[in-house]
């Protein structure tokens, strides 16, 4: 379409004269317009052909940009840089995330210890250099899949390994810290409570039994902890150092506010050693001068006493109280028996025992002669007066005499004797008919007018 320059009437391009005013149209203008339209159409065709190429080129640029972005964050070198930056900047949370595995959760405090251990035992500059070299060699190698970074003393501190690929192009590097098991060996059953892997943990260890408390990455640890024993509750620390271990375990040193008690007894020379006891906080234990008792909490008073026997009588010291303010890691205390009282009692009992032994010597001298006469004459009446009638021993000896199986005895010696009411227990050493020395234990009963009679006997 075109318009008349004189009246503005619209007309077709091929019309030569305006139907409104009769004005004659310029034919050159029509030809120019036609030529222009053809040029535009040609240019449009060219542009449509260029669009796919432009889109393809744009996509290629995007791919190249994306590749470099991925490379910056996912190449082995980039993965290495992330770990290095975290260690350099003491980013314990990032290090904990990088080192945590499905089987071993590393918390931020453990990561903090690990960072310090690397800086102390390897040196940051050396660690970075070793790590980059290790990653480079693994990345180039077709056969190697893992390698270790070590401390100056030769201990493994970081395992670097290939773990598949990232986005097809890049090796995925895995960084894992090797672990060891800290072990405790308490003297008595102990419960330990502490934080590990970001969670509260409880470990119960039996007395004198090696017990692991978990898995830890390299470091020098001082872990706040509580422990509980039969003696009480303690606050303190569990300490262990990977530098002090060349095995899969590391010994734990306990650092708690505790007191250990060493006891010295005085005035106890007349007491039977095996009878001596120490009672601490109402808990009775065997006494030993070389033994250390405890540990006990340093924030509570301790009560302590001792006891022992002499001639079957129990003697006790006064109970002492050790104030909490006086308790130290090693606390010594002396407990005193009334030695004069003990000696007087022992002297009295020894006189009684000597009197009893004399009676028994006389009794068994007569009994051995009567026993042998009964054997020789096959007559129970010789020995019957020495044995209580109605006792099982009475019937047994009578039966043996009748069967001729009664054994002859000689040279009786009183080894030991004790009296409890009207009953007497005596250990007698004899020589039997075979000439062998034997010890026999007899039980006797003391009747009216101090008459002694046998009730039973047994081999010692």
Curated annotation (Swiss-Prot):
Compartments in which it is found: Cell membrane
Organism name: Staphylococcus aureus (strain MW2)
Protein name as it appears in the record: Membrane-associated protein TcaA
C4-type zinc finger segments: 4-21
Gene Ontology BP, a term: response to antibiotic
The entry's keywords: Antibiotic resistance, Cell membrane, Membrane, Metal-binding, Transmembrane, Transmembrane helix, Zinc, Zinc-finger
GO terms assigned for molecular function: zinc ion binding
Extracellular side: 71-460
Bilayer topology: Single-pass membrane protein
GO cellular component: plasma membrane
Cytoplasmic side stretches: 1-49
């Amino acid at each position: 379409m075109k318009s008349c320059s004189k009246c503005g009437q619209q007309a077709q391009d091929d019309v030569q004269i305006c139907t409104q005013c009769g004005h004659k149209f310029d034919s050159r203008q029509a030809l120019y317009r036609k030529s222009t339209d053809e040029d535009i159409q040609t240019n449009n065709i060219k542009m449509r052909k260029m669009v796919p190429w432009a889109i393809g080129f744009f996509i290629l640029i995007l791919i190249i940009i994306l590749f470099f972005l991925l490379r910056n964050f996912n190449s082995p070198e980039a993965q290495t840089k992330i770990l290095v930056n975290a260690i350099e900047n003491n980013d314990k949370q990032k290090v904990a995330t990088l080192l945590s595995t499905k089987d071993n959760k590393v918390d931020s405090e453990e990561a903090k210890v690990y960072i310090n251990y690397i800086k102390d035992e390897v040196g940051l500059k050396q660690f970075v250099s070793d790590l980059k070299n290790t990653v480079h060699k693994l990345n180039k190698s077709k056969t190697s899949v893992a390698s270790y970074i070590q401390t100056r003393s030769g201990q493994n501190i970081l395992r670097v390994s290939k773990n598949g690929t990232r986005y097809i192009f890049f090796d995925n590097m895995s960084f894992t810290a090797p672990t060891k098991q800290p072990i405790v060996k308490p003297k008595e059953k102990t419960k330990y409570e502490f934080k590990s892997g970001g969670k509260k943990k409880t470990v119960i260890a039996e007395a004198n039994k090696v017990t692991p408390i978990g898995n830890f990455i390299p470091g020098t640890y001082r872990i706040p902890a509580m422990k509980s024993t039969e003696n009480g509750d303690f606050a303190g620390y569990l300490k262990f150092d990977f530098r002090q271990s060349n095995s899969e375990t590391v010994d734990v040193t306990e650092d708690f506010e505790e007191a250990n008690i060493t006891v010295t007894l005085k005035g106890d020379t007349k007491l039977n050693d095996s009878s001596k006891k120490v009672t601490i906080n109402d808990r009775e234990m065997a006494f030993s001068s070389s033994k250390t008792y405890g540990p006990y909490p340093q924030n509570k008073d301790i009560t302590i006493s001792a006891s022992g026997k002499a001639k079957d009588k129990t003697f006790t010291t006064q109970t002492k109280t050790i104030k909490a303010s006086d308790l130290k890691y090693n606390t010594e205390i002396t407990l005193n028996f009334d030695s004069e009282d003990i000696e007087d009692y022992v002297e009295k009992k020894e006189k009684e025992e000597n009197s009893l032994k004399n009676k028994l010597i006389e009794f068994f001298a007569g009994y051995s002669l009567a026993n042998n006469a009964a054997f020789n004459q096959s007559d129970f009446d010789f020995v019957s007066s020495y044995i209580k009638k109605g006792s099982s021993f009475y019937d047994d000896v009578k039966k043996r005499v009748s069967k001729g199986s009664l054994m002859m005895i000689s040279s009786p010696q009183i080894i030991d004797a004790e009296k409890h009411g009207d009953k007497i227990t005596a250990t007698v050493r004899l020589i039997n008919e075979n000439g062998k020395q034997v010890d026999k234990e007899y039980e006797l009963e003391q009747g009216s007018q101090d008459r002694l009679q046998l009730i039973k006997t047994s081999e010692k």
